[in-house]
Amino acid sequence: MHRRCAGPIGIGQKVIVRETLPNGVKLIAQEMTGFRSVSMAVWIQAGSVYEIGAESGISHFIEHMVFKGTESRSASDIAAEMDAVGGSINAYTAKECTCFYAKVLGENIDLAADMLSDIACRPSLDPADIEREKGVVCEEILMLEDDPEDLAHETLSTVIYGDSPLARPILGTQDTVRAFTRDDILSYMDKRYIPQNMVVSCAGNFKMEELRAAVNKRFDRRGRGDSYVPQKNQLIKEKCFRAVEKDIEQVHICLGFPGFPGDTEEQFALLVLNNALGGSMSSRLFQKIREEHGMAYSVYSYPTSYSDTGYFTLYAGTGEKQAAKVVELMLREIDSVKKDGITKEEFARSKQQLKGNYLLGLESTASRSSSLGRGELRGRIYTDEELIRRIEGVTMESVQDIIPRVLDTERMAGAFVGRVNKRETEVKRIFETA
C-alpha cells in the first residue's frame, strides 16, 4: 500500500509517504530539506492494555531489557555507537504502545535504522540481565509512589477507568515484575513484536529510497501474533473518590471528567476549552488559584485521548489546610464555564495558541516523526494544512456543545494524595455536593 499526502505548510517539507512494506511493517515518512537531523521511531502495539493478569508491566519491562544488549551489540556498544555520532536513542511505554526513537545527523540514518531494528527485533534477553533489571524496575515503581504528583495522576487513571484495560498500571506491580521469566518475555514478544504490529516513522534529512530499503531489510522479526483484542474501555458512570495518605507537605488534587478519543471533532473542541480553563498561564484556573489567591504554584488542566475513549484532568498542588478551598475554587470555575461558557476573547486566544504550538513544533524533526507515528497508530494522518483547518473549524457552538458532556460533575472522579485523612471529610463533602 502506498499513499501520499500533501503537506504544504512549512519550509522544505515534502509529501508524507505512507507504505506497508513487503515485510509487513507500516512506514510513514516525510523528508524535510534544510534540516541536518533525522528522527526515526519504531511504534509497537504493546502496552498495558494488551497485558493479561500476570503479564502486568511486561511491555515496560521489555522496553528496559532490549537496551541491555542484542544479538550483535552489548549495552555498552549501543551507547558508544550512538555517542560516537552525537546522536541519541531512547524509549517509552504507554498504555497502548511502546516507542523506541533515535535522532541523528542525516548521514547516520543507516545506523539509526540498524540500531532501532536490532533492539526491537533481536534483543539478547540474557537471564542474568533480566534478574538484575527486575530490581531496577521495582525501584522505578517505588519512585513513582514517592512522587506525589505523578501518583495522583496515576491514581486518577485507575479510578476513572475502573475495571477497563486502561486502568492497568504501565509499570505493573513489584509482584508481577519479580515473577517475569525469559520464557514469559519471549512469549509476549512473539505475540506483540511482529511486523504487522509495527509502525516506523521518520522525518528530516534522508532519502526515501534508502529508508524504505533499510526498514524492509532490517525489521524482519517473526512471531505467531496474537488474536487478543482488549475489551472496550469505559469510564466510570458515577462519582468516585480515592485518597492516598502520604506524610508530605502538600495535597495533590486531580479531578477527572469524561473526554473523547483522539480523532474526533469533539477532541479539537476540548483542546480549545482546555486552553481557556487550565492549559495556559492565561487560563482561568491559573489566574484564579495561583495569581489571585496565591494558593498553588502548580495548577493546570489537560485532555488525554486514546483509541476509543479519553478523559479530562484538572490538577492543583496546595498546602494541607488549603486543600478544601482549592477544590472549591476549581469546582467554582467549572460551574462558571458550565453556566456562561468561555468568552469570545478566550476562544480566539485558545485557537491561536493551538495553532502556534503546532506550527512551532514543525521546526523539530523529532516532533514531526512523533506526530506521524502517533497518527498512523490512530489510523489518521493530518497534513499541516488539514490540522490547521480542523483547529480553525472549531466554533463557539462546538465548544459550548461539549461543555456539559465533559464537565459533568455527576461523573467526576477525584484522586487526592497527601495528608488527606485530617481533611478528607471536608474535601469529600465539597466533592460530593458539587
Protein language model features and the residues they cover:
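M16/MPP (pitrilysin/insulinase) zinc-metallopeptidase core fold and M16-derived inactive scaffolds
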Residues: 39-103, 279-295
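N- or domain-start disorder-to-order transition segments that initiate the globular core
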Residues: 8-37
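A short local loop/turn or secondary-structure capping micro-motif enriched for an aromatic residue
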Residues: 36-38, 109, 263
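Active-/binding-site microenvironments in catalytic and ligand-binding cores
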Residues: 36-38, 92, 206, 234
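Short alpha-helix boundary/capping segments
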Residues: 50-57, 261-273, 277, 281, ...
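His/Glu-based metal-binding/catalytic segments typifying zinc-dependent metallopeptidases
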Residues: 41-43, 226-283, 390
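Charge-rich, well-structured scaffold segments of protease-associated domains
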Residues: 5, 20, 31, 75-227, ...
